Amino acid sequence: MPTIKPKNITALISAYSRSDLNELDETLNSLWGQNLAAESVLLITDGPTPNKLNQVISYHQLHHPKLTTIQLEENQGIDPALQQGLAEINNEFFARINSDDITLPHRVEHQIIFLQNHSDIAAAGTAVIESDDHIYQKTKNLNLATTKIRSLPEKDDDTVRYCRINSPLNHPSMMARTAIIRQSGGYRQLHFMEDYGLWAQLISIGARLHNLPEPLTYFRTLTAQIQRRTGVGILKPKWQIQQNLISYGITSKPQAIFNLIVRTFYRTIPRPTLKK
């Protein structure tokens, strides 16, 4: 088995003015508590951020020199922010994590072992543990806040088939080979669809994907997050990703139209209706 090299790994995070400082603090602490910590953590602050959030970031920089930050002058959105981060990474591998999620202590270790043992895999995701943030804020107990395990197809052939209808990897759980992500074009501007677009780009150049069945990240589910991803505003990016799938030869136009109708129906239902 290849020697595990944590110095080859960067964790990539993006935060912005409305990022919760307590959640970011928990996210960073979960990275410092890894059994096998990444060599560096790169935090992209997407535009100006409040003083209290900056204080949290400064505290972690003071106590953890491996944390590097890049401040974007204006808020550009998560796609350009991650693309900027991707351009700055010098390590062979990078792991994505949301600024409000919590990584389990063995996440980095298990993913890097898998990727070093499977040189044909470009990116490896994992199952994620969805947690209700309202319950977590009241109890501070992730087990009590857990709502479900979100698992996706494991093997490459299955991820390709799944990509025809939905995003085949949980983006906040992903570890990937930096060079191949850059080769695919990286993060392009697809509102709320940047991860789906990235997987499609990788498949289009023949890169192989995989999902570990083990849940290694606590993924917060928030009402505001769901509201941003519902309504008619989601139609345009949904259709754009379907057009991309057609152009890459991943799906056909009839299948794409069917996908748009079926997969978008739930997203366009007003949130109050969904809560009934």
Residue ranges and their predicted role:
Residues 106-144:
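Conserved donor NDP-sugar-binding/catalytic core segment of glycosyltransferases
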Residues 72-89, 110:
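Glycine-rich, basic loop-to-helix element that forms the pyrophosphate-binding segment
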Residues 98-102, 127:
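The conserved acidic donor/metal-binding loop of glycosyltransferases
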Residues 45-55, 98:
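A conserved acidic beta->alpha catalytic loop
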Residues 11-14, 151-233:
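Conserved nucleotide-sugar donor-binding catalytic segment
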Residues 94:
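Short aromatic/hydrophobic "clamp" motif used to bind/position activated sugar donors
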Residues 18-33:
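Short, well-formed alpha-helical segments that are part of the catalytic scaffolds
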Residues 6-10, 32-43, 65-68:
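Short loop->beta transition adjacent to catalytic acidic/histidine clusters or analogous donor-positioning motifs
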